Amino acid sequence: MRPLQAEIIKALHVAPTIDPEVEIRRSIDFLKAYLTKNTFLKTYVLGISGGQDSTLAGKLTEMAITEMRQETGDDRYQFIAVRLPYGNQADEADAMAAIDFMQADVTDRVDIQPATDAMVTALEANQLTIHDFNKGNIKARQRMIVQYGIAGEMHGAVVGTDHAAEAVTGFYTKYGDGGADIVPLWRLNKRQGKQMLAALDAPKHLYDKVPTADLEEDRPALPDEVALGVRYDDIDDYLEGRTVSDAAAEKIEAWYLKTAHKRHAAITVFDDFWK
């Protein structure tokens, strides 16, 4: 095993194999424990895209909230799923299929296009040119603004979808989808998430589809693997301690080192990881 590979696996707490049922229960208990400890919280809020990660996080959240209601008799516990399209999005049918599967207590829909476009217009009024990639990150941050707006009114915490395969590559928007209160998928790679969804009898097309962040307008539905330059199978193998090609390992490690700032709080004078 490569030296940095061992360090990454340890840092991200990835197991070489999982028992899906055990990990499902682990995530549910984790979500419940956070609510039990923080009695002022009564809801979990999660943005739903129709992809694998939000489908899994959403189902686990729904199961945790259902158990909290049953065990406490407190009907204020709710899971709020939020659709956050930018105008009309191609994944709408998948998003609704995911919501049907997870059976959220409340489903909200907020179109982020007006707020995103207004922000871009305001920035460009200052002689800035907002490129498409940057605008994509603005979309991701607008989505998190909405989720925190809902959570703030509903005594809630925002659930994140980050997992080990995203964490190792930094493939998320800082203070966008990377900004959340609790992340029940942390420790899992992409392959393990699929195993859990299969165990939960999720619609197969929701986790067999090609993963895409779909934030860029110039490159709509750009596959994650194209953007990253490495396959998820290679990322998963690497995180499970397996041997991958030197090219794949070097690409993964380059992403890990380049995106270290995303896995840390704001840098202080006491931090030296970036030096």
UniProtKB/Swiss-Prot annotation:
EC number of the protein: 6.3.1.5
Family according to the record: Belongs to the NAD synthetase family.
Keyword Nucleotide-binding belongs to the record: yes
Catalytic activity field: deamido-NAD(+) + NH4(+) + ATP = AMP + diphosphate + NAD(+) + H(+)
Alphabetical UniProt keywords: ATP-binding, Ligase, Magnesium, Metal-binding, NAD, Nucleotide-binding
GO biological process terms on file: NAD biosynthetic process
Quaternary assembly: Homodimer.
Role this protein plays: Catalyzes the ATP-dependent amidation of deamido-NAD to form NAD. Uses ammonia as a nitrogen source.
Binding site for Mg(2+): 53, 166
Disulfide bond entries: none
Listed InterPro entries: NAD/GMP_synthase (IPR022310), NAD_synthase (IPR003694), NH(3)-dep_NAD(+)_synth (IPR022926), Rossmann-like_a/b/a_fold (IPR014729)
GO cellular component, one term: cytoplasm
Gene name in the database record: nadE
Protein name (record): NH(3)-dependent NAD(+) synthetase
Lineage of producing organism: Bacteria, Bacillati, Bacillota, Bacilli, Lactobacillales
